[in-house]
Every structure is written in structure tokens, then in C-alpha cells.
Amino acid sequence: MKFFALFIQRPVATTLLSLAITLCGVLGFTLLPVSPLPQVDFPVISVYASLPGASPETMASSVATPLEHALGRIAGVNEMTSSSSLGSTNITLEFDLNRDINSAARDVQAALNAAQSLLPSGMPSRPHYYKVNPTDAPIMILTLTSDTYNQGQLYDFASTQLAQKIAQVEGVSEVSVGGSSLPAVRVELNPGVLFHQGVSLDAVRKAISNANVRRPQGYVDSEQQHWQIQMNDELKTAENYRPIIVHYNNNSPVRLQDVANVKDSVQNVRAAGMSGGEPAILLIIRREAGANIIATVNRIREQLPALHESIPASIQLKVAQDRTPTIRASIVEVERALVIAIGLVILVVFLFLRSGRATLIPAIAVPVSLIGTFTAMYLCGFSLNNLSLMALTVATGFVVDDAIVVLENISRHLEAGIKPMQAALQGVREVGFTVLSMSISLVAVFIPLLLMDGLVGRLFREFAITLTTSISISLLVSLTLTPMMCAHLLKSQRPKAQKKIRGFGKVLLKIQQVYGRSLMWVLNHSRWVLLILAGIIALNVWLYINIPKTFFPEQDTGRLLGFVRADQSISFQSMREKMKNFMQTINADPTVDSVIGFTGGGRVNNGFMFISLKPLKERSENAEQIISRLRIKLANEPGANLFLIPVQDIRAGGRQANASYQFTLLADDLNDLRKWEPVIRKALGQLPQLTDVNSDKEDKGAEMAIIYDRDTMSRLGINVSEANNLLNNAFGQRQISTIYQPLNQYKVVMEVAPEYTQDVSALEKMFVINNQGKAIPLSYFAHWQPANAPLSVNHQGLSAASTIAFNVPEGYTLSDAINAIERTTTELRVPSTVRGTFAGTAQIFQETLKSQLFLILAAIITVYLVLGILYESYIHPLTILSTLPSAGIGALLALELFDTPFSLIALIGIMLLIGIVKKNAIIMVDFAIEAQRNGNICARDAIFQASLLRFRPILMTTLAALFGSLPLVLSSGDGTELRQPLGITIVGGLVMSQLLTLYTTPVVYLCFDRLRAYPNRRNCCRQFEHGQRGKTGTYT
């Protein structure tokens, strides 16, 4: 410790060093981004392919299957799922967390290129991919509404102007536009007139396609001039298309306007967005990985006035949802808890030392250690988030411990009359190794967590590094700044000048005396203490096995997601009305601030909602209670169900479901899956541990099965390709031409007019022109019958899959639900051909359950190795670690008492306790070893004297850690769900540990000393009880 004597003797250098640490920390703080949780990027890529008009089964067999075969060969794919619906296929690839997303994207593009030749020729565009981060919810949603512009025009404004400008804002990664589609010219055919005129639908398609072409025409050069050739070969509007001649009948032209209604509309009329139940276009904004979410939202808001000016005045642009208010409030709450924690630990120091000057020393040392941590956080690319700020709050109790141990020991020498400089040098020399052991062993606790891979390792790496950095800086400060300030701020006291003990000091003296007498009794009955310690270890195991467990505390972020599932045969118009009814009911609730949503696309019977709740201080219910109440109010809508889940800051897995957790059934034989899925879903729906049980299996959609008579077709001169073209042209919203404009490209869409497709009689009006030019009705060579057909076909890997989604009701935990599902599937005796596996968050939870015990054991073993190296002993580390069972039982009992499930946050609390509670044992054992080595006294005398002599710093450090964590327990604002489990675990563990380890540690120390000395140990201290009576020390 001679090195640190230089800092005590050079106050200017030490002061400037501390100032430099503080200034760098302040600079780092201003540069740190803000986010709700540490950035955890799941490498997920989604592939999208479309074939308008194709059935889900056709999309699955002709598009999804060849793509899956190609994509499944990519290295590092953990899971591949696909969902094929009407006209579209989505394939989601979840890669290993260590896989670089950019490298994976290149492999995906190569696989798509390789599979291109196997895909149908009629696809309007090649399959494309986009990167997805399932853990990152939208940071802001804007809406566009207008009384004068239609939805297509609003969508055009949003996609061509607003989305481009918002995407250029620093921190924005993606702007998605939803609620409608781009403008288009729609050609709505009249089948009766076409038949009367003898014009086939394919003839109309070819006429339109040939009338609108864009090809280079070239140029003409003369000796003096150059001319470009430009022709009127493009048609831009519906008015331009109406005069097109599609056929001649008796030398009279048949124009498009004669056989169809040609109008300016949108590409997809079966898509709708709403805000508060009224039509709206949605701009969904996501941030870049690692971007400051609050700064990004602020920059977007700064751009809003300019965006308003770029669009017509009759268009209203509004912020419908902003993710940052709850994040701001949560960060403020954690910062408030941090300030309160600092104040409480300083109060603890003042109560024990009763000196303003002595209290000033940790009041300076603690902020220097905490503020300096911001520098390391910035250099490591971390952010200010709930976990990193919680780490600093908890660290408040840790960093003051080092200062307390040094300060208390120097104060003891000053009370003995030693001069300040000498007291500082001697005090650091005596406890320097103790402080070093405390800090290094605490840092060692987090080594396994830092080396851990997967979600848990990624999520808590910032927490661990932030905490270990603050502890490391605290170690430096406690051995440099703290003793230097003691040497120059504190004064020595002559023994005769000591003040009379009174007030809090008198209370502490009484407590110490009681402790001394009780410790003597315990040392005389050590066998009972060892039996109690064994019982505590057994109780720890029982409590850990039986305590309810969950993955992550359920957060109230002020946002809900709504999933609407209607009857599978519902029309788009009816679905839109049901969405409107649901949204109006939700919007009328006093706790709801806004609701927006959309429906349509490949699954007409599905809808999606974003719901913003009022700030927590303006409502008396949490998100889960609001969902329970709304569930009852929304249950009366016939033919449709609305599932609500609270939005979480962390979500595992790339799949989206109608509930928070998923259980997937896989089968190689689709018939097995169809047989067992309803049975399992019904059984799970009856379990009290589950609610909102639903499945993505939709195989009851209404279908009209058309059966060709191939012999008749051959006789009539018609082939299958012509018949299929007829149906696609009539009912598939077929995109038959492209309109090129300076800002965008628009489509010409053709189908039979809606008034002729209200029922199956529309098929009777369809006809084909055969090879002899005659109009042959579809009914001549085909018949049809109603049937059930899937609205979606789902795969996982290359197996047929069906996902059962569920939520967990109040009063139960995720572990309860998983155990109930596993028990039920076993009782049903599901055959081995149908496999059940948990997905998403439930799957990650199962994986973390397996690693939790390993993580705790690894932390204990690491601490043992570090302590063994520091003490050059196999025995003393075991004595120090004997404090852990009492802390564990305190933490688990506290969680049970507060009805809080054991989660990842509680696990971190347990690991922190491993580092905290052993400090008491280190302080006692270190002094006992020193006393035995230098004082030539027996182990019993040494540990007794160490326990009494170090009673005050032990009590001070424990109370400092306890009060540092107390604000987390008592917090009540935004983000409480994350903070309370950590605080409850630490406070419960510290209270129980303080009550028990003051007795168990001396007993274990003596027990190991006897084992080590056996069989030649001496029977020392025969007059121990008589000689030590009254030796309990004093306070001044």
C-alpha cells in the first residue's frame, strides 16, 4: 500500500485527478443516448413474396416451399417460420445472436437469387427481404386525415413526401406507411356487356397493356440539329384509358368505357387504416439501433412544422402515438431514486460518525465514483436506460462501503489521538487489503454474467459493466481521495477530550453490548448454529424450486397492442365495421388517450391496433387491470374477438401472435396436425393458468372449389391456362400495367366490378373465347361447389405448424402456465408425430431457467477462486461464502412476502447479494487473521475481537447498501415493475444476512479453524467468557 501513500502526501495531484475523473464523466453523460433498456439486436430477416390472387395453399406450395428449401441451407439459422395467406408469403429467419446481420442478409439475397427459377412466372416482383429487430417497437406513429383528399392520395403524400423526409432525420431507420395503398387506375369490368360484345377478359388485359408502353424511341440527327423522339405512348389517368379500343364488333369499335367502369382509385381496395374509428393513413417510425430515442423523437417533432408546410392545408398531420413520455418519466424516476439513495447513504455515515467533516468525505467520494462511470459507459457504447441507472443506484451503497471502511478505520485512529496524516497512512495500510478484497470479489461475481451469451448476457452486460466500473473507480477513490481528505479535513482527539456518548452513539453502544453477550452464547453453542445454517441451506433449495418464476417483470409502458380475429368467412366491409366498433369502444374508455389501427391485406379477417394509455399519474389502474376490464366490455361484438396485450420494452423472437406467449405444434403430416390442434387448444383453453388462448390455424375460410372437365375443355378448344387466366383477370386484382410518374410508379388494376361479385352467381357470367373465336361460358366446362379452405398456411422449418398463443392471467406466473401446458399435453397422450415446443419469450424463459442455477454457481465458484488467491487459503473463502445462504433465504422470502415472482431482475439481485453480504465476512475474517498472525492469540479470541471491533463498519456498510436499494423498493412511478424486484431482493437479503451472519460467520470460522488444526489443536481461552465479559468497546 506504499503506492497509495503518495496520493495522501500529494493532495493537489489527488484533487486534480479526481476532478479529471468527474469532468470526463460529466462529458460522457451529455453524450450518452437514452433508451428504455439496453439495445439487444436479434438478427432477424423477413422475406416477402407476392402473387396477387393466389390462394394460401398455392402460395405455400409454389412460393414458400422453394424459398424455404433455399433459405434453410443458410448457416446460423436458429428458426425459420413462414405464413402464406391470400396472395402473399412471409418467411421469418431468426439467426444465432452471434451472427452478423449484414452477412446474413447477403446470404439471404444469394438464396433468393438461387430460388428465382423455381418460382411462378406471374409474380409481379421478385421476393425481397428486410431486416427486423423484434425488440424495437415504433418510437412514433403519425396519422394523415383529410375531408377533401381520398385515402389513395393521402397514402401517396405519405409515401412519396413525408416518409422520405422523416427517414432522413438522424436516428430514424425505417418509416412504414399503412392504412391504404398507392393510387391506381382501376378497371372494373361488366361481364354481361363483355359477353354480349364477344370480348374476353384477356383481350381487355392485352389491349390495356399494349396501349400503355414506355420504351426508348431514339433520336434524329442532322448536320445542324439534334432531335429526341417523344411519343404519346403513355397513359396517365383513368380519363386517358377510357377511350382505348379493346375490340371491333361488326367493324364498330368497342371501347374500354363501353365494357368497364374506369376510375382513379387505389391498388388494393381491401386495406383500411383508422384513427379513433375514422379513416387515416399511418406513418410508423422506427429508430436505428443504438440511436438516442428521446433525441430522435425531438428531432422528428422539430421537423413537423416543415412537414405541415409541404402538404396541402386541408390535410391534417397529427402525432397519434409517442413512445417517449413513459421513457422520460421512467428515467426521471430512476434518477430520483439515485439522488435519494446518495442522500440516504450519506445520512448513514453522518449518524454513525456524527461529524460534518467526516460526512463530507463520502459525500464527495460517492459522486466522483458514480459520475466517473459515465465515461466508461460512453466509451463502451452504452446508453442511459433503466438497467444502467439501476446499476448506479445500487452501486451507491457499494461505492460508499469502500469509503466507509477506510474512513471508519482512520477515524478510530484519530479518536485514539494519532495525528491526521499518520492516522490516514496507518489506516489505509491496515484496511487496504480488506478494501481490495471486497472490491475484487464483488467484481468477480459478474465475470460469469459478462461471459454469458444469449439474451440474458446481452441484456445485462451493460448493468454488469456499469456496476463493476463504478466499483473499480470507487476502489481507486477510497485508497487515494478518501484518505487524503481524511488527512487534511479531520482532526485527532486526545483521549481525555473525548465527548460523552449520547444520542445515536449511545444506542449503538447498547446494541454492540447486546451483540457481544449474545455472540459469546452462540460461540458456546456452535453446534446448534451449524444445524441452523444447514437448515437454511436446505430451505434455500426448497424455496428456489417452488417460488413462482417468470421471464421478465410485466411492464406498464402506457401502450397496448390489439389483435382482432373475426369469422374466417367475413367480408372486408364487415371487418372494417367491426374494427370501427372496437376502436370507438376503446377510445371512449377514460384511461385511453388514443387508438389507431388497420385491417386488410392478405388476411381479411385480421386487424391490428396501437392503443396509447393516459400517463400513469392520470389513471388509477395499471395496464393489466385495464386489459381485464376492457376484455369484458369488448366481448359483445358478434363474430369477432379482440385480444389485448401490454407492450413490453423487451420481446424475444421474430414471430407476431395474438398474445404474449406461444406454444407451437409441429407435424410432418398435415392431417395429424389438423386432428390434434383443436383438441390441444380446447384443453389449454380450460386451464385457469392461461387466458386469451387462440390459434393461428385458420382452415375454415369459405372457398368455391371449381372442377374442370378436361375432356369437355379439349373438345371445346379451351386449355387450363386460358381458364386460369380468366379467373385471375376477373377476381385477382390483377396488375396489368404501370404508370410512370416523376415521384412514383402507379399500377393499372383490372377485375370484375364489385357489384357482379356479391355471390357465386358471378361465376356463371364468366366465359372464355375458344380457339374458334366463340364465347364459351365457364359453366359449360366446369362446375363448382362451396368448401372450406385455409386462410393461411404456416410452416416452421419444413414442417406444418400451428401456434397456440396465450396470456397469463393475474395471480399466475409464466412458470405456472408452462408447467400446466406440459402436464396437459402429457395427459392427452399426444402422439410422437405431433411435437410441441414453446416459442418466443416462453422459449427464452425455458432456456434461462436452465442457466440460472449455473450462473449462480459460477458466480460463487468465481468468488471462491478470487478469495482463495487473495488469502492464499482453501478454508477462509469458505468461511466468507458461508454468509450467502442467509442472504438467499432473505431474498426469496421477501419476494414471496411481496407476491413478486422470481424473474431475471431478481436473479441479478441474488448475484448482487453474493457480492454484498460477503463484505461483512471479509471485514471480520481479515481482522481475525491479522490478529492471530500478529497478536499471537487463539482463533476464538481473534474472531470475537474482530466481530466487536468491526461491528460499526459492518453495520454502516450494510445499512448503506440497504438504504441505497430502498428507493427501488419504495418507487411508485413509471418503470416501477423493473425496479421493485431488484430492490426487494437486495433489501430482503441484506436484512436477513445482517441478522444471521454476525453469528454464523464467527462459528464457521472457528469450525474450520478446528478442522485445520485437528488433531493437534490446543484448548485455548479457558477463561474466555470470564475474561471477555464487558469488553464491548466504546463510541465517541
UniProtKB/Swiss-Prot annotation:
Its main location: membrane. One of its GO terms (molecular function) is xenobiotic transmembrane transporter activity. The chain crosses the membrane at residues 12-34, 336-353, 360-382, 431-450, 463-485, 528-547, 853-875, 895-917, 949-971, 986-1008. Coiled coil: none annotated. It holds the Pfam family ACR_tran. GO terms for cellular component: plasma membrane. Gene3D superfamilies: Multidrug efflux transporter AcrB pore domain, Multidrug efflux transporter AcrB pore domain like, Multidrug efflux transporter AcrB TolC docking domain, DN and DC subdomains, Multidrug efflux transporter AcrB transmembrane domain. It is a multi-pass membrane protein. InterPro entries: AcrB_DN_DC_subdom, Acrflvin-R, Multidrug-R_MdtC. Keywords: Cell inner membrane, Cell membrane, Membrane, Transmembrane, Transmembrane helix, Transport. It is found in: Cell inner membrane. Belongs to the resistance-nodulation-cell division (RND) (TC 2.A.6) family. MdtC subfamily. HAMAP family: MdtC (MF_01424). Part of a tripartite efflux system composed of MdtA, MdtB and MdtC. MdtC forms a heteromultimer with MdtB. This is Multidrug resistance protein MdtC. It comes from Photorhabdus laumondii subsp. laumondii (strain DSM 15139 / CIP 105565 / TT01). The gene is mdtC.
